[in-house]
């Protein structure tokens, strides 16, 4: 049996610059099907299942290199390969907020959940990947209910708004805010701005989706870039579009609208950046980026972090055991079928020689009990080896000793406990009136 292995390719702000993460993310459509892609403001991760992870990785990286224009060596060096328990442990930590720029943020759990939904909408997702992401979501819920991590509701957006508020003397209810983008982060940003008292709120979308976005969320749709930036004193970039606002464009708009030199806070949360970093050279303009937020994010309590790490580690270990158990279940079922087939063939010979008698029925009953006892040891041992990560050795032994060729288990395969035992073959003779003690 060829064993399917879970693996992930991880590129995050912790290892490479956000510009590279953004360009890799832009090429995600080139990645083969049957994968789940997690792309956020500071990470691009690919989760997949393959019999040969090295080959699958090479194919994905080649596709990304072609789509992004990056050199293959740069694409390869940008990713960290995770296999085994590390895959689950990493994803569960991400979903729980442990690996975020703002530790404990809650938005990431929703992004993990949506990543699976988006993948399932596009194509069939392998069972192991579905279970991986579903378990990640459950782990995030456990962290939320059992620890104080993220209890203060901090997120990248909230910390960024805190920084913008600290640097401005204008009260929140007097600010004029514009949100760039119409995605999930834009929706979260609008909600947080309203919580702080901002009522003069506009949305700008270079793709023209602002009107539909504000129709269900409130606010005003800015029809042009000049309208969006002309009177605002707070701008939050969440779009990640290809149309980056340059320093020259912003300076020109501020000059034409008579706002040059006036205070303007720009929060750029887009992975591919909505604003050129050079805007900080303009008078009165302050730029806050994801890196700014990461450095300023308050630390969580040590006890909450430790509790979360324990929950994540246990969940990852349990998940890995469940994967190993599923793979060895197929071998256990195959061994039972093989043994029962031998028994049935032998009983056919007994009946052919001695007829369908009470004695033959007694022999069959005794043999089936013996086979059940003989299989108990190998079944228990299979579970023990699976728990130790040695299920491959067990499967190889069955193939060598009995010549049993196993097929890869399907995602919907029944666990061993739910597979009914093989019933003894029925005998057409009614032996109810026969005294079994006389047939020995």
UniProtKB/Swiss-Prot annotation:
Subunit structure: Homodimer.
HAMAP family, sorted: Glu_tRNA_reductase
InterPro entries reported in the protein's UniProt record: 4pyrrol_synth_GluRdtase, 4pyrrol_synth_GluRdtase_dimer, 4pyrrol_synth_GluRdtase_N, GluRdtase_CS, GluRdtase_dimer_dom_sf, GluRdtase_N_sf, NAD(P)-bd_dom_sf, Shikm_DH/Glu-tRNA_Rdtase
E.C. no: 1.2.1.70
GO BP field: protoporphyrinogen IX biosynthetic process from glutamate
Site positions (Important for activity): 90
Similarity annotation: Belongs to the glutamyl-tRNA reductase family.
Domain notes: Possesses an unusual extended V-shaped dimeric structure with each monomer consisting of three distinct domains arranged along a curved 'spinal' alpha-helix. The N-terminal catalytic domain specifically recognizes the glutamate moiety of the substrate. The second domain is the NADPH-binding domain, and the third C-terminal domain is responsible for dimerization.
Keyword Oxidoreductase found: yes
Domain of life the protein comes from: Bacteria
Gene name in the database record: hemA
Binding site for substrate: 40-43, 100, 105-107, 111
Reported function: Catalyzes the NADPH-dependent reduction of glutamyl-tRNA(Glu) to glutamate 1-semialdehyde (GSA).
Protein name (database record): Glutamyl-tRNA reductase
Residues annotated as catalytic: 41
Source organism of the structure: Renibacterium salmoninarum (strain ATCC 33209 / DSM 20767 / JCM 11484 / NBRC 15589 / NCIMB 2235)
């Amino acid at each position: 049996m060829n064993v399917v292995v879970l693996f992930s390719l991880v590129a995050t702000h912790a290892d490479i610059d956000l510009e590279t993460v953004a360009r890799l993310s832009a090429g995600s459509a080139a990645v083969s099907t049957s994968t789940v892609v997690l792309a956020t403001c500071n990470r691009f991760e690919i989760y997949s299942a393959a019999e040969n992870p090295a080959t699958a990785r090479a194919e994905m990286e080649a596709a990304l290199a072609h789509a992004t224009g990056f050199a293959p060596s740069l694409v390869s060096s940008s990713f960290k390969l995770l296999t085994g328990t590390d895959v689950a442990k990493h994803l569960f930590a991400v979903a729980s907020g442990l690996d975020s720029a703002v530790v404990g943020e809650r938005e990431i759990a929703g992004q993990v959940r949506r990543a699976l939904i988006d993948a399932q909408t596009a194509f069939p997702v392998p069972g192991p990947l579905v279970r991986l992401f579903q378990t990640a979501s459950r782990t995030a819920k456990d962290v939320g209910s059992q620890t104080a991590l993220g209890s203060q509701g901090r997120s990248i957006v909230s910390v960024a708004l805190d920084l913008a508020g600290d640097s401005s003397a204008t009260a929140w209810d007097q600010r004029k805010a514009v949100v760039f983008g119409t995605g999930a982060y834009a929706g979260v940003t609008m909600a947080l701005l309203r919580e702080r008292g901002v009522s003069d709120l506009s949305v700008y979308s270079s793709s023209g989706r602002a009107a539909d976005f504000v129709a269900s969320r409130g606010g005003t749709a800015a029809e042009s870039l000049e309208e969006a930036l002309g009177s605002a004193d707070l701008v939050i970039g969440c779009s990640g579009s290809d149309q980056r606002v340059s320093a020259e464009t912003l300076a020109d708009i501020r000059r034409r609208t008579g706002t040059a030199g006036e205070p303007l806070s720009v929060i750029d949360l887009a992975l591919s950046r909505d604003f050129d970093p050079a805007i900080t050279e303009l008078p009165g303009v302050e730029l806050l980026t994801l890196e700014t937020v990461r450095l300023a994010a308050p630390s969580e309590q040590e006890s909450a972090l430790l509790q979360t790490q324990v929950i994540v580690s246990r969940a990852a270990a349990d998940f890995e055991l469940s994967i190993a158990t599923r793979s060895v279940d197929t071998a256990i079922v195959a061994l039972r079928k093989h043994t029962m087939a031998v028994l049935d063939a032998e009983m056919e010979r007994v009946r052919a020689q001695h007829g369908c008698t009470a004695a033959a029925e007694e022999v069959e009953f005794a043999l089936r009990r013996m086979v059940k006892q003989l299989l108990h040891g190998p079944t228990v041992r299979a579970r023990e080896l699976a728990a130790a990560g040695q299920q491959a050795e067990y499967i190889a032994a069955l193939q060598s000793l009995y010549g049993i060729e196993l097929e890869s288990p399907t995602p919907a395969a029944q666990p061993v406990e739910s597979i009914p035992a093989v019933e003894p073959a029925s005998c057409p003779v009614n032996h109810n009136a026969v005294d079994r003690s006389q047939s020995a």
